[in-house]
Amino acid sequence: MEVVEILKELLKFKSITPDDDGAMNFINMFMDGFDADFVDVNGIKNLILTKKFGDGVHLCFAGHIDVVPAGDGWDSDPFEPELKDGFVYARGAQDMKSGVAAFLCACKDATKFNGTLSIILTSDEEGDGIYGTLEALKFLKSRGNLPDFALVAEPTSSSTFGDTIKIGRRGSVNGVVTINGVQGHAAYPEKCVNPVHQLASVFSDFAGYELDSGSKYFGASKIVITDIRGGMEVVNVTPKSVKIMFNVRNSELTSCEDIKRYTEHIFNGFDFTLSLKESSKPFLTDESSKIVIQAQKSIENICKISPDLSTSGGTSDARYFAAFGVPVVEFGVVNDRIHAINERVLQSEVESLYLVFKDLIENFE
C-alpha cells in the first residue's frame, strides 16, 4: 500500500489520547517482518518494532499515534479522512499520523541498510506523556538495545515542507510564588500587610526578566507571567495573599536551580513560598552529529532546499531520547494546522516525507 493509503487507514482510528483505538494492532500486522514488543504501562499502549539487517548502527524512528480531541465545527467527519484539492483532511493529519505513515512505509520498504531499524510508537504524547516513549526507552535499555540515533517525525516544517529540522528543544519550568500578607480593612492600610503592594514593588524586576542572553540555537530564558490571583473580589478588604504563576522556557544556559535562585532573590524579605516543577530539560543535538548531517542531506536530495536548524516550539518526546544520550532530530510536514479545526496535510508532502526517510535509511552508515 502506498504511503497516503496507510495514512488514511491510520486517520480512521479515533485514537484520542491516551486511547490507540486499535491502531497499534493494525500497525503491527502491517509491519510484518519486524519483531514486535508491546510495552503497556498504566493502560498506555506502546509498540516497539525492530528489524536487524546487519551489524551496523541502530537507527530509530519514533512518533505518537494519539491525537487531541477534534472538537466541533469541522466541514467533514474528523475521523473519516477526506481527500480534497490535494489535501487529506482529518484529525492527526499533520500531528502526526503523516509522519508515522511515512516512516512505517520507509522502514517496511528498506532493503539497503547494514544495521538495525527500529520504530517506537506511543499513545501517550498529547496527554501526560509520562508512560509512553520514556517507558519504551527504559525497556530497550533493559535489553541493552538503545538506538544509536533517532528521528522523531513531528511536523517541524514551518512554511515550506523541508524548511526546518529541530535539533533540540527548550526546557520548561513552571513556578508558583505565593506572597503572604495580613488581611484587613482597606481604610486602615497601616494595620495590614498588603501582598499586592509588595509584589508591585518588585514586579518589574521579575516579569519578563531574561535569565540569560541565549545562545546560537536558543533564545533567552525569560520569565513569563501566566496568572496572578489575590483578594476576594471586594473593594474594602485587602488580600491575605497573592499568587503569581509563571513559566520559563529555558536554554541550556539556565537551570531550574538558577530560576529558583533568582526568584528567591527577588522576593527576599517577603513572607513567601515558592514551588517549581521542571517538566522537561533543554537539550541540543550537536550540528556535527551524523543524524543531523544525513537528515540535512536527505532533505536537500528530495526537497531541493537547505533546512534551517531550529529549537523553537514546545516540548516533544525527543527529550526522552536526549535524556538517554541518544542523538536525536525531529523532522516532518508543515505544522500550520496542528490541533486546529479542519486539520489537513498536503498529499505531496506525505509522499515527499516518505522519500526523505527512505533516502535517510539508504544512505545512513
From Swiss-Prot:
First and last residue of the signal peptide: none
Protein residues bound to Zn(2+) 2: 95, 126, 339
InterPro entries membership: ArgE/DapE_CS, Bact_exopeptidase_dim_dom, DapE_proteobac, Peptidase_M20, Peptidase_M20_dimer, Peptidase_M20A
Class of the enzyme per the UniProt entry, highest EC level: hydrolase
Catalytic activity: N-succinyl-(2S,6S)-2,6-diaminopimelate + H2O = (2S,6S)-2,6-diaminopimelate + succinate
Cofactor details (free text): Binds 2 Zn(2+) or Co(2+) ions per subunit.
Gene3D superfamilies: 3.30.70.360, Zn peptidases
GO biological process, one term: diaminopimelate biosynthetic process
EC number: 3.5.1.18
Active site, per annotation: 66, 125 (proton acceptor)
Keywords: Amino-acid biosynthesis, Cobalt, Diaminopimelate biosynthesis, Hydrolase, Lysine biosynthesis, Metal-binding, Zinc
Annotated TM spans: none
Cofactor: Zn(2+); Co(2+)
GO MF terms held by the record: acetylornithine deacetylase activity; metal ion binding; succinyl-diaminopimelate desuccinylase activity
Chain's role: Catalyzes the hydrolysis of N-succinyl-L,L-diaminopimelic acid (SDAP), forming succinate and LL-2,6-diaminopimelate (DAP), an intermediate involved in the bacterial biosynthesis of lysine and meso-diaminopimelic acid, an essential component of bacterial cell walls.
Subunit description: Homodimer.
NCBIfam families: dapE_proteo, PRK13009.1
Name by which UniProt lists this protein: Succinyl-diaminopimelate desuccinylase
Source species of the chain: Campylobacter fetus subsp. fetus (strain 82-40)
Gene name in the database record: dapE
